[in-house]
Structures are given as structure tokens and as C-alpha cells.
């Protein structure tokens, strides 16, 4: 394995690049945006071993209202491509968790999911009505939310994408969800009551615990790394709390 410091993704997939650009543009709208320093061994990872080619690039930032803005771009053995993004709110602010994942296998989008997941009690009242108005009528292959998906909002979107048109429409859904998130973040005011902050921390902890029940994440990584490395990566890079 060779770890390198990279400034932009090496992936050339048009859909991933379009989504990545959209996410970065919305991220740039956040106040007081700063990069977060992390272990370079965990941020950018490359392997050129034939048959086990691997490329992972991570971006870490923080901003007003957000403790961690994480974007991961990955390609495994040239046939599995992943874009993963989670924006974790600062518990002092009543902002939902933005999450988005795209999985392509041999250029087929098997999974596309986006959500603003509640990070406090009754938080959904603030934004569910806006999410429900986002047009999702064009998609033909909606997928069932897994059992651990109780962490998601009522308007989580999860589907396989069957055409270029659906790929374009998914980009629009992501754009609208991000726009709602940015609006909520700009309206949010800091909270200083410890019991409220603790409740929000517990929501984020539960979000991470439930996400770690997704065995597909570890199954992919275990093909390239040992169990100790995979557990550390999942708990420190993907879903820390």
C-alpha cells in the first residue's frame, strides 16, 4: 500500500465528478470553513497491485455549525466506485445530518441514497415539508430501507438508477437537499444548555452505531485490509462520535 497526498480525485466517472462538484460548491457556502488535519495514512490510500487496485481519497473540513464535513471517493479493482459523504453537525447547533452515498458496479448505479437525518428530537418538523416537495417522481427502482435505517428521515431517498436521465435527476435531488441544509445551517443559533447538547450528541452516536451495522462497508474493505485496520477506519474516518 502506498499513501499519497492528493489534491483532487483521480476518478474520471462523470456522475461522481458532477456530484462531487455540487457537494464541494455547497460546502464552500458554509461560514468559517476550515480543513481538518488527519493521519495521512487514513486520508489518501493507493494500491497498484494487479487485481487489487485500490484508490481512496478523503476530504475533511469543519465549519460553523458542523464538526466534520467528510467526503470519500473510492475505487476498488477498477469495477467498484463509491462516493460517500456525511456532514456531521456541531451539537451546539440544531442542524440535521446530511448523508449521501453512490455505489457503481461496472458502471451500473446499484445504490444512490441521500437524506437529511434528524440529529435531535422533533427536528424533522423544521425541514421534512421541504424535503417532501423535492420531485422524486421520475425514479423507477426505489429500494427498501434496511432495518437499521430508522435513523433516516421520512423523506430519505434510496434507489438504483436505471438511466442517464435518472442519474441527472438524482443530482438534482442531492442539490436540493444540500440547499435545504445550507439554509438550515445559516438560520441555526448556538445552544448552550448541556442537556440539549448531550441529547444531540446521543443522536449522532446512534446514527454512527446504526451505520456501522451496514456490513457491506466492512465486507468491501476486508478484501484489501485486515480487520483491525478496517475497524479503525470505520470508527475514526467514517463514523466517529
UniProtKB/Swiss-Prot annotation:
Keyword Isomerase (UniProt): no
UniProt cross-references to NCBIfam families, sorted A to Z: PRK02816.1
Protein name, entry field: Phycocyanobilin:ferredoxin oxidoreductase
Alphabetical list of Pfam families matching this protein: Fe_bilin_red (PF05996)
Purpose: Catalyzes the four-electron reduction of biliverdin IX-alpha (2-electron reduction at both the A and D rings); the reaction proceeds via an isolatable 2-electron intermediate, 181,182-dihydrobiliverdin.
Family the UniProt entry places it in: Belongs to the HY2 family.
Species annotation: Prochlorococcus marinus (strain MIT 9312)
Alphabetically ordered keywords of this record: Oxidoreductase
E.C. numbers: 1.3.7.5
Catalytic activity: (2R,3Z)-phycocyanobilin + 4 oxidized [2Fe-2S]-[ferredoxin] = biliverdin IXalpha + 4 reduced [2Fe-2S]-[ferredoxin] + 4 H(+)
Gene: pcyA
Source species, domain of life: Bacteria
HAMAP family: Ferredoxin_bilin_red (MF_00618)
Molecular-function GO term, any one: phycocyanobilin:ferredoxin oxidoreductase activity
GO BP annotation list: phytochromobilin biosynthetic process
